[in-house]
Swiss-Prot record:
Keywords: Chaperone, Cytoplasm
Alphabetized Gene3D superfamilies for the sequence: GroES chaperonin (2.30.33.40)
Gene Ontology biological process terms, A to Z: chaperone cofactor-dependent protein refolding
Function: Together with the chaperonin GroEL, plays an essential role in assisting protein folding. The GroEL-GroES system forms a nano-cage that allows encapsulation of the non-native substrate proteins and provides a physical environment optimized to promote and accelerate protein folding. GroES binds to the apical surface of the GroEL ring, thereby capping the opening of the GroEL channel.
Organism: Caulobacter vibrioides (strain NA1000 / CB15N) (Caulobacter crescentus)
Protein name from the UniProt record: Co-chaperonin GroES
NCBIfam families membership: PRK00364.1-2, PRK00364.1-5, PRK00364.2-2, PRK00364.2-4, PRK00364.2-5, PRK00364.3-3
GO cellular component, one term: cytoplasm
MF (Gene Ontology): ATP binding; metal ion binding; protein folding chaperone; protein-folding chaperone binding; unfolded protein binding
Short name of any one Pfam family annotated for the protein: Cpn10
PROSITE patterns per UniProt: CHAPERONINS_CPN10
Subunit structure: Heptamer of 7 subunits arranged in a ring. Interacts with the chaperonin GroEL.
Subcellular locations according to the entry: Cytoplasm
């Protein structure tokens, strides 16, 4: 199934969090928090401005982003757990 977000929404796959610290301590599942970092899977065409023109989004598929702790709505697409969020929920793009 192919999914295309509408408007200024982006589809994000969370980046898996490390299960072991740098010091070698294994973090149990009960102590883990969901990561606030992910990879953009798909983007919508953009939001409309006051004149009715579509303004393209600043993020694109493949970007690694940071987002707020409570951002987005969890969805399942092709068996994958993903998030749909507005571009305004994206805090920034992680550049390598």
């Amino acid at each position: 199934m192919k999914f295309r977000p509408l408007g200024d929404r982006v589809l994000v796959k969370r980046v898996e969090e490390e299960t072991k610290t740098k010091g070698g301590i294994i973090i149990p599942d009960t102590a883990k928090e969901k990561p606030q970092e992910g990879e953009v899977v798909a983007v919508g065409p953009g939001a409309r401005n006051d004149k009715g023109d579509v303004v393209a989004l600043d993020v694109k598929a493949g970007d690694r982003i940071l987002f707020g702790k409570w951002s987005g709505t969890e969805v399942k697409v092709d068996g994958q757990d993903l998030l749909i969020m507005k571009e305004s929920d994206v805090l920034g793009v992680v550049e390598a």
